[in-house]
């Protein structure tokens, strides 16, 4: 199944009218949803995809016959269960390198597995909770879970996320930036020193990847941030391809994984704000990650081999 047609549902996140209808029919037929998984089938060059962030995949549904004698729970119970199980499922999806554009679709499975586990979910008025409302809750908790991952990022990057959500790469007032910096335990001057912020004439803005210095060396960066890692990787990937990006990943070592995690959060922000160009860059980096990682490992092994040969040669002489 491949569908992406969002509908804004004020106060309860974003739902998908196509999924509402389809899942309701599956459940009515007596099935429960136990999983969803994206399979790369959709063509980026099809007419409806030109100029848009279309799904990269169709979605495989894993279904089982529902237990009609299952328990009845309340909406509050469902929220508690989703907050317990969905974060674990999200980590699994990210580790499997699901494309950010497919993340919301992939999360439907674990969320609906909880919803269809029970005979009924009752709202505050004692009425059955609809599939539409269940999907809204799943999307809401997915957003909350991604926001909670911000705790893995450094203070400068948390500031950049908050600023980017409001202004993107556009200019904003220095005073607003300074107030936000205090809340994030950093400073505008420090952010400028970090190398990704420009401050001039009472205005500040985050530098675009193409504006970042081409001679950047993470090993010499005294204020290395997750934000810099992501955007330098995008710069290198777009200008030099996967091979050059792999060289940078090899330099970053284990820190690179946190940069990949940040891409998911940034993609979600861009999609919500309808910033298609930026969203495309974050999605492309994650989709290229397996090949970049493979090339980085190959480069590391080659360097180790060369070092061993050099050492043996020195011993011989």
Task: Provide a role label for each language-model segment.
Residues 1-34:
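Conserved Class I SAM-dependent methyltransferase catalytic core
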Residues 4-10, 36, 40-46, 68-71:
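Flexible loop/turn segments at secondary-structure boundaries
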Residues 5-17, 49-54, 96, 217, ...:
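Short, contiguous acidic/charged loop-to-helix segments that flank catalytic cores in large enzymes
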Residues 31, 68, 116:
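Residue-level marker of positions within ordered structural domains that often coincide
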Residues 33, 59-63, 111:
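Generic structural hydrophobic/aromatic packing signal, biased to beta-strands
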Residues 46-98:
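Flexible, glycine-/basic-rich loop-and-beta segments that form/coincide
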Residues 92-317:
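C-terminal accessory/interaction regions of large nucleic acid-associated machines
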């Amino acid at each position: 199944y491949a569908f992406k047609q969002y509908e804004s549902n004020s106060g309860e996140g974003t739902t998908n009218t196509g999924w509402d209808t389809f899942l309701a029919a599956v459940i009515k037929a007596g099935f429960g949803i136990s999983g969803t998984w994206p399979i790369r089938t959709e063509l980026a060059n099809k007419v409806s995809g030109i100029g848009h962030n279309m799904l990269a995949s169709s979605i495989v549904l894993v279904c089982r016959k529902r237990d009609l004698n299952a328990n009845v729970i309340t909406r509050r119970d469902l929220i508690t269960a989703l907050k317990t199980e969905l974060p674990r499922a999200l980590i699994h999806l990210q580790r499997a390198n699901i494309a950010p554009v497919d993340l919301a679709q992939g999360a439907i499975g674990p969320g609906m597995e909880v919803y269809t586990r029970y005979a009924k979910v009752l709202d505050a008025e004692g009425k059955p909770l609809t599939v539409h409302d269940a999907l809204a809750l799943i999307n809401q908790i997915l957003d909350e879970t991604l926001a909670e991952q911000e705790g893995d990022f450094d203070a400068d990057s948390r500031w950049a996320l908050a600023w980017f959500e409001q202004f993107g790469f556009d200019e904003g007032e220095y005073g607003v930036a300074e107030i936000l910096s205090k809340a994030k335990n950093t400073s505008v001057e420090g952010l400028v020193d970090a190398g990704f912020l420009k401050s001039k004439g009472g205005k500040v803005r985050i530098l675009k990847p193409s504006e970042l210095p081409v001679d950047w060396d993470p090993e010499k960066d005294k204020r290395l941030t997750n934000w810099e890692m992501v955007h330098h990787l995008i710069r290198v990937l777009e200008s030099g391809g996967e091979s050059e990006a792999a060289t940078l990943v090899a330099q970053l070592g284990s820190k690179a994984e946190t940069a990949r995690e940040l891409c998911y959060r940034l993609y979600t922000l861009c999609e919500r704000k309808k910033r298609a160009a930026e969203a495309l860059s974050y999605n492309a980096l994650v989709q290229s990650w397996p090949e970049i990682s493979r090339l980085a490992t190959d480069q590391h092994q080659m360097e180790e081999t060369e070092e061993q040969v050099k050492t043996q040669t020195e011993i011989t002489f």
